[in-house]
Regions:
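Juxtamembrane membrane-water interface segments of multi-pass membrane proteins
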Residues: 1-3, 44-50, 116-129, 159, ...
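Transmembrane-helix bundle segments that line or gate the permeation/cavity pathway
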Residues: 15-155, 176-198
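Membrane-helix interface motif
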Residues: 145-160, 243-258, 318-325, 391-392
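Short aromatic-rich membrane-water interface segments that cap or initiate transmembrane helices
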Residues: 163-176, 260-277, 334-344
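Membrane-embedded alpha-helical segments of integral membrane proteins
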Residues: 308-357
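Internal/C-terminal transmembrane anchor helices
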Residues: 364-388
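Hydrophobic alpha-helical transmembrane segments in integral membrane proteins
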Residues: 380-404
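Extracytosolic and intramembrane catalytic regions of membrane-associated proteins
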Residues: 407-456
């Protein structure tokens, strides 16, 4: 199947799914349809392990959106589809390049659209295809367009067809056609220019032989002076961090407990400080081990201090993790506290990868290439799991459970709240939840969100 055929097919699918509908089950179906067509179209040589994993995650993301219909599942579909399209074109390019290439494709869309010779067939079309265009598609387009114009200009003309109860919103049809074509064109006509392969060279995970030659970074510092600056800096920072860890843990676990508001403020400030410290720590390692120091036999002290610096930062993260856990036990779960866990876990992963970078003599790009997949994994986990339900189930066990807060601010908590209402005999809460659920369940099939159908 050619690109232009896929563009027309998926544009028609988009219009069919979204005409007269709001976003819901239809978007999940669209995502799965794109994934299946991509699998069908992609040449066997590009169907490697990464491509097949991305195919599965794209389908699962589509299912997640059909189930929840929220922003994070939309983001999961968006990122998964871009990566799938990218890997269907090249198996060797780093996935980190997918987003920049996608943005370039969006910007250059007007130019690429008018390059008809690149995406429309230049040879003579088959007889059947010509008949389809000449007898069906072109006449149908003009009939629909002029029918809408004449109906708007004459009530009597429109009334001729009222017995058929035929309603047609031309502008919605036209807008959906344009949007569907824009999406389909940029997906199927996904172009990777030559300069991208130059970027890919800069994102290599391993050093080339010429990168291993010992040379100073700056002209005003020779190699010995630069090495010494690294040793002094990292030694001083290790001492400073060790003192900070001691005071940090004393303030968190030894001092007299404070009021909830004060404790909340201090906890968030400390976690922010930890995250910033981790970013700076990784930045320090990247700065000193960006090149020849990875292969400098005289840089053993520098490497030991760097690894010590990484280990101490892991200890700092674990301290913050324990404090956040204590905070959750004392005051319950929220989205923000779950977010803190996510950031701290990503921080530990980043530090472990930094340790591997130093130990295995990897490039700085190695860190970014690997962390990209972990961030993508976090998006997938956030989209697949009902975190609102987990938060509500956890907090329901508390004596100070705030029903209204979870009713308004925590998403997808209705099933847990119905259980709570049943246990407490709260008929008012039960009726409110069911009334809201019934209004959502009344939507047309393609506009439904599957989760709403489970609320009974």
């Amino acid at each position: 199947m050619k690109n232009y055929q896929l563009i027309l097919l998926t544009t028609a699918l988009f219009i069919t799914l979204f005409y007269g509908e709001s976003m819901g089950l239809n978007f999940g179906i669209l995502a799965i349809g794109y994934a299946l067509l991509t699998l069908y179209k992609t040449h066997e040589k590009y169907r490697n392990r990464n491509f097949l994993i991305l195919f599965i995650t794209t389908v699962l993301s589509g299912v997640a959106f059909a189930w929840y219909g929220d922003f994070i599942s939309f983001l999961a579909v968006f990122v998964s589809a871009i990566l799938l399209a990218f890997k269907s074109k090249s198996r060797d390019l780093k996935s980190l390049l997918a987003m920049p290439v996608f943005v370039v494709n969006l910007i250059t869309f007007p130019y690429r659209f008018f390059k008809f010779e690149q995406w429309l067939p230049m040879r003579k079309s088959s007889v059947n295809f010509q008949k389809l265009i000449s007898v069906v598609l072109i006449p149908a387009f003009f009939i629909i367009m002029f029918f809408a114009i004449y109906s708007a200009g004459s009530k009597h003309f429109a009334q001729i067809f009222t017995d058929f109860h035929f309603e047609f919103n031309f502008w919605e049809f036209f807008a959906l056609g344009c949007l569907g074509f824009f999406i389909a064109f940029n997906y199927w006509n996904f172009k990777i220019d030559r300069y991208v392969f130059g970027w890919n060279h800069d994102l290599k995970n391993d050093f080339l032989n010429e990168d291993k030659n010992l040379k100073s970074t700056y002209s005003f510092l020779d190699l010995d002076a630069e090495r010494m600056s690294g040793v002094v800096s990292l030694f001083a920072l290790n001492v400073l961090l060790l003192v900070f860890i001691i005071t940090f843990n004393y303030e968190q676990f030894v001092e007299i407990p404070k009021s909830p508001n004060k404790l909340s403020e201090e906890t968030h400030n400390r976690v922010n400080a930890v995250i910033f410290s981790i970013l700076m720590a990784i930045g320090m390692i990247i700065f000193y081990f960006k090149g020849s120091f990875n292969f400098d036999k005289n840089a053993k002290s520098l490497k030991i201090l760097a690894k010590t610096w990484i280990v101490l930062n892991v200890v700092l993260v674990l301290s913050a993790f324990l404090k956040n856990a204590e905070y959750v036990i004392s005051y319950g779960l929220t989205y923000k506290r779950l977010g803190v866990y996510a950031f701290l876990i990503l921080s530990v992963i980043g530090l472990i990868l930094t340790f591997i970078k130093v130990q295995k003599q990897k490039t700085n790009a190695f860190l970014f290439n690997q962390m990209f997949w972990y961030f993508y994994g976090v998006i997938l986990v956030c989209s697949f799991v009902n975190w609102g339900g987990i938060i509500t189930s956890h907090n329901m066990e508390r004596k100070d459970f705030a029903v209204n807060f979870h009713r308004v601010s925590i998403h997808f908590s209705e099933r847990q709240l119905l259980k709570y209402a049943s246990e407490k005999g709260d008929e008012k809460l039960r009726d409110e939840i069911l009334k809201e659920a019934k209004s959502k369940q009344a939507k047309s099939f393609l506009s439904k969100v599957i989760y709403d159908e489970t609320i009974k």
